[in-house]
């Protein structure tokens, strides 16, 4: 009973006293906002990069744009996301005071590099005969891509895009390095107030785990549904 009283006191100190649970609530809200908007930015940019890259692969066009995209992919995929976040915060967007906006841009630019390769592989996985069929119907290149190729590619890559969302959710845990309140930072602030590391950090880990498990379950259900639709 003594140990249960001790645990109750620790839970009270960490979450109830001075409404400390609000650090977790606010942090979780910011984490979700950053992840959603960063993924949206990543998908838009990633699709544009993928279309440039596949256009170059298919017909050799857009050589300069393709070169820029290749350099972008090499830099983003070859450097740690934390360094990218710090460079964007301290150098590129040093005058921007909205830290959530900075984080969205940093994680969105990072995500775009991975989304681009997912989309590109999805487009390339669509049978070349589909492309030729579109052209034979009198559609030009961009119409064929928009009406025939991309709708099929999206179906192929949806699970991979959702997995990218899950990866990005976990990556945002470094947002605290720019002094921003995210879920991880919220737990760390409680730790610094109570000098108790175990309970707040385990709570943060459990929240991430529950969200990731729910999203992973959604991905599995989607994959099963897509497979059953193909039969």
Give each language-model segment a name.
Residues 1-231:
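Transmembrane alpha-helices and adjacent helix-loop boundaries
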């Amino acid at each position: 009973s003594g140990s249960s009283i001790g645990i109750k006191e620790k839970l009270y100190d960490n979450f109830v006293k001075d409404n400390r649970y609000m650090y977790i609530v606010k942090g979780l809200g910011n984490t979700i906002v950053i992840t959603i908007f960063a993924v949206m930015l990543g998908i838009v940019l990633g699709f544009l990069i993928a279309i440039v890259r596949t256009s170059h692969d298919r017909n050799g066009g857009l050589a300069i744009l393709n070169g820029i995209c290749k350099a972008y992919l090499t830099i983003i995929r070859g450097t740690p996301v934390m360094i990218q976040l710090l460079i964007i915060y301290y150098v590129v967007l040093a005058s921007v005071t909205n830290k959530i906006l900075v984080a969205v841009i940093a994680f969105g630019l990072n995500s775009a590099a991975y989304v681009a390769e997912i989309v590109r592989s999805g487009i390339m996985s669509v049978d070349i005969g589909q492309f030729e069929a579109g052209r034979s119907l009198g559609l030009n290149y961009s119409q064929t891509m928009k009406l025939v190729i991309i709708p099929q590619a999206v179906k192929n890559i949806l699970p991979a895009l959702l997995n990218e969302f899950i990866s990005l959710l976990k990556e945002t845990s470094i947002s605290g390095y720019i002094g921003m309140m995210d879920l991880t930072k919220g737990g760390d602030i409680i730790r610094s107030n109570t000098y108790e590391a175990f309970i707040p950090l385990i709570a943060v880990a459990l929240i991430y785990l529950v969200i990731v498990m729910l999203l992973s379950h959604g991905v599995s259900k989607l994959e099963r549904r897509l497979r059953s639709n193909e039969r």
